[in-house]
Amino acid sequence: MKFVDEATILVVAGDGGNGCVSFRREKYIPNGGPDGGDGGDGGDIYLLADENLNTLIDYRFVKSFRAERGENGQSRDCTGKRGKDITIKVPVGTRVLDQGTGEIVGDMTRHGQRLMVAKGGFHGLGNTRFKSSVNRAPRQKTMGTEGETRELMLELLLLADVGMLGLPNAGKSTFIRAVSAAKPKVADYPFTTLIPSLGVVRMDHEQSFVVADIPGLIEGASDGAGLGIRFLKHLERCRVLLHLVDLAPIDESDPVENAKIIINELQQYSENLAQKPRWLVFNKIDLVGPEEAEVRAKAIVEALGWEGKYYMISAANRDNVNALCWDVMNFLNSQPKAMAIAESAPEKVEFMWDDYHREQLAEVEAEAESEDDDDWDEEDDDGVEFIYER
């Protein structure tokens, strides 16, 4: 199945049903009181995280979702039926952004997580709500409000413990093939990897971690060169990054400059991502020999001013790969399992009609208590529209 990690959808919640103006009419009861019921609330729209999905391709074709409108109120104090909700399934790891405001509506990080993204309109009130000691036969009602409309950007971010960085042909796909059952394509030309891939590294029967391989970066990626930096977002939730440096580039380029390119592109993309724990891994030591590899590695470390630990491996021959994986496993075990992305939790999203119910009923009660003022035609100051019927 084609991997799609971005999609834009339109969600429209259902409108609220209108209130009803009606009076009780039965035999021997010529002057019955008001019995107009309230309308039904509009349907809401939810997102549901599903671990069985791994792409957003479905929403490249179906881009609009509309919930059901609430039914109008009826006589005999019958409340209108509530509109049906809509639930949209998305892969675990999906981030939801409001295109209109730019706010993060939520992060779908757990299987079964449910998130409301559009709230249905509030129901209108029937004339029964407006009866009082000074208004025995109210002929006013309120209309249902409109449901929320949002244009959402869905971004799928892979959930991995370890992320891999490097130029094209640095050996990232070879490494992930060596340590896991994943089989990304490997060839001797740039950009063999076109989409992100995940591999599970099993150290023993009880311990494992997930590693993410993304397409290689090149200089100018932040300006759109190559495949750009659109795949770097998949590393935001990783707890540690492995920066692979080719000790023997096939194009005879300078490994120091190659390493600086990746560091520079990382900083231009996100300061938070640039500050993540990052390990330097020198690959392809089998092509230059152990002694020459050590000399080149030390020269690169000095040129970069690197103060952390570095590793020397051959992903193709699996030299020193197992030791690196165990160090990664021990590092992950020593870190909290909280989300690695270092940003504040999104604020609570305010929906259009959150306080509508309380405000509207408070207005009705205030009108009922005001015995010296029964002018129901007075314009409402709070914007609640009353409809009068004769």
UniProtKB/Swiss-Prot annotation:
PANTHER family given in the database record: DEVELOPMENTALLY REGULATED GTP-BINDING PROTEIN-RELATED, MITOCHONDRIAL RIBOSOME-ASSOCIATED GTPASE 2
Keyword GTP-binding: yes
Gene Ontology CC annotations of this record: cytoplasm
GO biological process terms, semicolon-separated: ribosome biogenesis
Binding site for GTP: 166-173, 191-195, 213-216, 283-286, 314-316
Lineage: superkingdom: Bacteria
Keyword line: Cytoplasm, GTP-binding, Hydrolase, Magnesium, Metal-binding, Nucleotide-binding
Protein role: An essential GTPase which binds GTP, GDP and possibly (p)ppGpp with moderate affinity, with high nucleotide exchange rates and a fairly low GTP hydrolysis rate. Plays a role in control of the cell cycle, stress response, ribosome biogenesis and in those bacteria that undergo differentiation, in morphogenesis control.
Class of the enzyme per the UniProt entry, highest EC level: hydrolase
Gene responsible for this protein: obg
Organism encoding this protein: Yersinia enterocolitica serotype O:8 / biotype 1B (strain NCTC 13174 / 8081)
Domain Obg positions: 1-159
Bias kind Acidic residues: ranges: 363-384
Annotated compartments: Cytoplasm
Segments of this protein annotated with the region Disordered: 363-390
Identification of the protein by name: GTPase Obg
GO molecular function, one term: GTP binding
E.C. number: 3.6.5.-
Domain OBG-type G stretches: 160-333
